[in-house]
Amino acid sequence: PHRFEAGTPPIVQAIGLGAALGYIEDLGRDAIVAHEHAVAEYALEKLSRINSLRLIGTAPGKGGIFAFEVEGAHAHDIATVLDRYGIAVRAGTHCAMPLLNRFGVTSTCRASFALYNGKDDVDALVDGIERARRFFA
């Protein structure tokens, strides 16, 4: 089989994967799920309070991914403003154009929260959206 292996095997990546799996195992799946749920609930509460922001997809029990649009501004413009404040979001159709057509939107911003995010990250996003909203008002 050696003749089919080009280059150096991904040894460092394998070690990194082992360390990541150990970290997740140490934290425990239940603790991770509880943390992500708490951050997602907090994000839903805070984002829902922003005037002129429309959340796309609000199914009960959804995870920590939030697609949204801000009235009067294109998603790419919102993403650019957020980037200036060090906030990373994705903007566009997210390879889901038929779904966006169903919701009647051309593009969205999408923010994701996971194990490594906290409520302070949600607050930073909300503050950035408010700044962008005022800029485009």
Where are the regions that the model predicts?
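Pyridoxal 5′-phosphate
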Residues: 1-137
